[in-house]
């Protein structure tokens, strides 16, 4: 999953 990398807030 790449979501965490893009939205790493």
UniProtKB/Swiss-Prot annotation:
Transmembrane segments: none
GO cellular component terms given for this protein: extracellular region
Keywords: Adaptive immunity, Blood coagulation, Coiled coil, Disulfide bond, Hemostasis, Immunity, Innate immunity, Secreted
Quaternary structure annotation from Swiss-Prot or TrEMBL: Heterohexamer; disulfide linked. Contains 2 sets of 3 non-identical chains (alpha, beta and gamma). The 2 heterotrimers are in head to head conformation with the N-termini in a small central domain.
Name of the protein: Fibrinogen beta chain
Domain of life: Eukaryota
Subcellular location: Secreted
Keyword Coiled coil recorded: yes
Species of origin: Papio hamadryas (Hamadryas baboon)
Keyword Disulfide bond: yes
Gene Ontology biological process terms, A to Z: adaptive immune response; blood coagulation; innate immune response
Domain notes: A long coiled coil structure formed by 3 polypeptide chains connects the central nodule to the C-terminal domains (distal nodules). The long C-terminal ends of the alpha chains fold back, contributing a fourth strand to the coiled coil structure.
Post-translational modification: Conversion of fibrinogen to fibrin is triggered by thrombin, which cleaves fibrinopeptides A and B from alpha and beta chains, and thus exposes the N-terminal polymerization sites responsible for the formation of the soft clot.
Biological role stated in the UniProt entry: Cleaved by the protease thrombin to yield monomers which, together with fibrinogen alpha (FGA) and fibrinogen gamma (FGG), polymerize to form an insoluble fibrin matrix. Fibrin has a major function in hemostasis as one of the primary components of blood clots. In addition, functions during the early stages of wound repair to stabilize the lesion and guide cell migration during re-epithelialization. Was originally thought to be essential for platelet aggregation, based on in vitro studies using anticoagulated blood.
